[in-house]
Amino acid sequence: YDVEGIILMPNRENANIPHSPEATSLTLAEGIKKNYALEKVFSEKVGNAHLKGDIHIHNMGFIDRAYSSYQSLEYLKKFGLNLPNSPSAAKPAKHPEVLLAHMVRYAAALQTQFAGSIGWDAVNVSFAPYLSGMGDREIKQFAQMLIFEFSQQAVARGGQAIFTYLSLPLKVPAHLADIPAIGPGGSDTGKRYKDYEDDSKRLLNAILEVYMEGDGSKKPFFFPIPVIQVT
């Protein structure tokens, strides 16, 4: 390896990786795992095809990881945050801001276990029971927190922003509609998620407003990636 070149020059393989000590450590570690993958995981024929450029094997530097993760907020809502190797555990959140903090920390932890993106299902629907009764201004402020907390977390692999996306359905999906809604403190609210459709739409509208406005420099947000579900 050209260790000096890796340390002094920015990573050209992934535009999301900054040029920092953490990033160069990632690049060096990936190089070792790429060699391992070519020698021990793939056949000689496949390895040679990759080296010649006939094919491209993506993310070989993460050969010991699954690619992507997609999960619901419901587990965090019900059980709180208790990460392996963490010196502390948190009970279920009683406030939306605390649930968001759990979500971001969990996403950061998951990013260390997967090679690709960390996705979240029906985010506006899951948060809706926590936002019921809030005014538009409060919901807009929470939407700003949601997007900025993810976009400014340069703590993932190599000091990247967390590669995450948010599923944002226009209406409560069928798989959640008749499910008992979990609210503050991990408790059953006595309602179904379909009863919170108005709250979920208000949050969705607020999130889209924040994306349209951009960050403090009027630049677009690259993360978290919004995925609008229309059906």
What are these model-predicted stretches?
Residues 1-231:
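Conserved catalytic cores of very large enzyme subunits
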